[in-house]
Amino acid sequence: NSQISLKWSLQSLLEIPTYLAGSYLLKKYSSLNLLKLSAIMITVQFLLFALTNDSNIIIILCVFQVFSTPLILITSKRLIFEVSPKKLRSSSQLIALSIFMGGSSLIIPTVAGFLSINIGYNYTLMVLSLFGCLAYCLIVLLNYLQE
């Protein structure tokens, strides 16, 4: 279906400006605040996905992608760099991103598939949006522990 490819194309294109503006955003805002913004936006995006049945609205909701994946990658790299010992920074980046990308690529489709079959797509999207809430709470905890 052309709408599926439009959604993924738009989503990918919208990420590019955020990657390009990454260093500016990190200078202007703290990594944890950007990460909190990402968690909120992912939560809202998934809740709105769950509440709509119109494929055109789903495509429009891809605008939220500007604030999600690119910010998560940029800020997580910065945070890992900051907390890693100097000698382990490269390895830390590699391991953390492997866990982040590989772990989520394994766990989320498995959980989403199971939930979709058992509770339906819309409820699955709502449940998955809770991961954004969990992430937000963990970011607040990390911020508290760093102070």
What is the meaning of each model-derived region?
Residues 1-14, 93-96:
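Loop-to-transmembrane helix entry
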Residues 12-20, 102-106:
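Residue-level signature of mid-helix packing/kink "hotspots" within the transmembrane helices
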Residues 18-31, 116-117:
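Helix-to-loop junctions at the C-terminal end of transmembrane segments
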Residues 33-48:
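Structural signature of the two symmetry-related core transmembrane helices
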Residues 50-62:
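Helix-loop junctions at membrane interfaces in 12-TM secondary transporters
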Residues 70-85:
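Intracellular juxtamembrane helix-capping segments at the cytosolic ends
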Residues 89-118:
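A late C-terminal transmembrane helix in Major Facilitator Superfamily
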Residues 111-133:
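A membrane-interface helix-boundary motif in multi-pass transporters
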